[in-house]
């Protein structure tokens, strides 16, 4: 008979649940249903020609849903999400920048991480297994302009956004195992505010996809003595068939294994 999982996080707290069929984990954030919604249920909404909206929670000087007042920021600005999907108050697990994650794990370490799900199946033997997840969520406003998306920015404005991404990731990596920069585009994809912005999620657990990719790269390096993505970049550049652009520091390609029509993979020239 199956036992019962020891860890049972509060129903309204961030946690992850194990898929009993695959052994993989899914992160849930029940408390997110309480956040305010300024998006739309079906139609795409995008502010055009409006530089300031007095009702926008992200415009400079406006009051957010939690009562805090935004500063009169003049460039890209980041702050902790008022309604975060993750919290660092539960299951804190500080991981240094040289621990597992972001391509720095050894093969043995990565194998250990990827088998967390299988180990849970073997030890807990429960179909309803969950555990707390610790993390931090940041919101990044690209510009004080309510309608200026990334595609409308100047090169210097884009550079400022990229610099903010770098600064945020560098700081969060000192504590969390995984840091993800992303943007939900459009109301149907979960964008609750039309003011151009992105997000960063930092979490103390590794996503399944990241663990699998790290395992593959570690195994390739052990057998070939060369970084997998370094070899792949060189092969794509030689072929030229799927190249999008190549610069002094980066190459962008449509990956050979692309799932989506406009999928691109950025490959750095230094590591």
Language-model segments: which ranges?
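Active-site microenvironments that recognize anionic phosphate/pyrophosphate groups
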Residues: 1-195, 201-271
């Amino acid at each position: 008979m199956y036992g019962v999982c020891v860890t049972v996080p509060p129903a309204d707290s961030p946690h992850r649940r194990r898929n009993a069929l695959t052994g993989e984990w899914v992160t849930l954030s029940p408390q997110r249903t309480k956040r305010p919604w300024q998006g739309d249920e079906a139609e795409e909404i995008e502010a055009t020609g409006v530089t300031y909206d007095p009702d926008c929670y992200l415009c400079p000087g406006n009051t957010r849903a939690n009562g805090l007042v935004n500063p009169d920021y003049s460039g890209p600005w980041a702050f902790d999400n008022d309604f975060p999907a993750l919290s660092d108050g539960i299951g804190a697990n500080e991981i240094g920048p040289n621990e597992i994650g972001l391509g720095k794990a050894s093969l043995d370490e990565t194998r250990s991480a990827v088998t967390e799900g299988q180990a849970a199946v073997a030890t807990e033997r429960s179909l309803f297994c969950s555990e707390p997840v610790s993390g931090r969520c940041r919101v990044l406003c690209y510009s004080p302009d309510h309608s200026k998306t990334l595609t409308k920015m100047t090169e210097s404005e884009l550079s400022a956004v990229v610099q903010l991404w770098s600064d945020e990731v560098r700081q969060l990596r000192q504590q969390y195992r995984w840091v993800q920069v992303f943007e939900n585009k459009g109301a149907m994809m979960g964008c609750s505010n039309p003011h151009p912005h992105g997000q960063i999620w930092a979490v103390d657990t590794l996503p399944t996809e990241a663990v699998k990719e790290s395992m593959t790269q570690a195994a390739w390096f052990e057998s070939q003595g060369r970084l997998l993505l370094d070899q792949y970049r060189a092969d794509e550049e030689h072929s030229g068939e799927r190249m999008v652009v190549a610069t002094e520091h980066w190459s962008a390609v449509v990956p050979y294994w692309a799932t989506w029509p406009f999928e691109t993979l950025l490959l750095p020239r230094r590591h």
